[in-house]
Structure formats: structure tokens, C-alpha cells
Amino acid sequence: KFLPKIIKIKKNIDSDFLKKINNKYFDTDGNKENLKFILEVAKILKLKKNSLLRTLKKFKGLKYRQEIIFQSKKLTIINDSKATTFSSSVSLLKSLTNVHWIVGGQAKKGDKFLLSKKNCKNIKAYVFGTKRKFFTSKLKKLMEYESFLDLKSLIKKLLREIKSKKNIRHTTILFSPSAASFDNFKNFEERGKYFNKLIKKYINA
């Protein structure tokens, strides 16, 4: 039987333990926070460190929630279709460098993008969908952007663009729409599945 208890979470994770985990899923600020909580609970439950380490190494998270769907030396592709507001995308954007951010969908009324211009210098936005004017109006003074009618034409152009560049530093394609999916999809799962399908089709085209 477990009684209610307030758990004090450590500010920092042991860097050596983090290296041993060697899982890109825990590289983002949000998932590092989740990992801190996991480690504290593991201590209370007296879980064996080696067993915990094996599990964390293999952990992939839930589908369409900061899901790494492709990784190479030069490119990482993350499917974060679950992100339906600007705030749900910001923490991930702050954690990454050299980001091609795919954004668009049914915008939430009154939604604000609270990221400073300084934190946007390594981000380029690729805006898609019928509501793209809403997104470009919010982002145009903060970062470079391109606008597309649909997700398919965006993916084809973006992948061609990345492949054509030689000697570029590591790049991340982040699909974090910051909007509801109802303009073109039944839900965020269908949207995430469609994104994965497009990447699979055009990544080696």
C-alpha cells in the first residue's frame, strides 16, 4: 500500500547516467523534466538501476508526441502532431538547434507565440494549410518562413532542400503544428500518421 507523499525532485540529472541512457527522446527540456520524476519514483520503489537503465534506453514514448521517426548523422525528424497550441511547441523548439519547424492547422483563437526573437534565430518555419495567414502574421517578425497550401508539397520541397545542401550541420525537422487538426484530419493521430507516410514516401526520393 502506498500513502500520498510529496516528492522533491532534484534540479539536475546525473550527467553520467544520462550519457548511459543514450536516448535522444530525453534530450529535450520537457522530457528531461519527466525523467527527473521517473528517477525519483524509481528510488522510492527501490527499482534496480540496471533494469531501469535498460528500459530507459529502449523507451520510445507515445506515438505522435515528440516521436523520433527518422535519425541519421545529419538529420533528425520528430513527429509531435499532438501539439495543438503554440505553448505545446515552445519547450521543444527551445531545446533544439537548426530547426525546420512545420506548423499549421486549425488555429486556436487568441493563441500567442511566446518565444523571443533571440530564441528564434535557429528556427525556420514552414507554414501549411488554409489558416496559414494566421501563423505567418504571428511569426514573420521573429523568423524566416515559407508558406505552403498543403503538407505534401511542403514535405517534398523541404526534403529536396535539405538533400541539396552539402556540409551542413545537423538539422532537425520538427512537425509540431501548434494547432488543432480538424481543418483536414479527424484528429491529431490521423494527422501524425499522414506525416509519417509522407516522410517514408519522400525521404529517399
Question: Where in this protein do the model-derived segments appear?
Answer:
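Short beta-strands and strand-loop turn motifs
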Residues: 173-178
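Short, hydrophobic beta-strand segments that form beta-sheet elements in well-ordered domains
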Residues: 1-11, 101, 124-130
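Short active-site-adjacent structural elements
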Residues: 86, 110-111, 134-136, 181-185
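C-terminal helical cap/extension that packs against the catalytic core
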Residues: 29, 110-170
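Phosphate-binding loop of NTP-binding sites
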Residues: 1-2, 155-157, 193-205
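Nucleotide phosphate-binding/pyrophosphate-handling subdomain across enzymes
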Residues: 24-122
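A structural signal for short, well-ordered beta-strand elements
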Residues: 45, 144-147, 184
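Flexible active-site lid/hinge loop adjacent to a nucleotide/diphosphate
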Residues: 1-8, 15, 19-22, 183-189
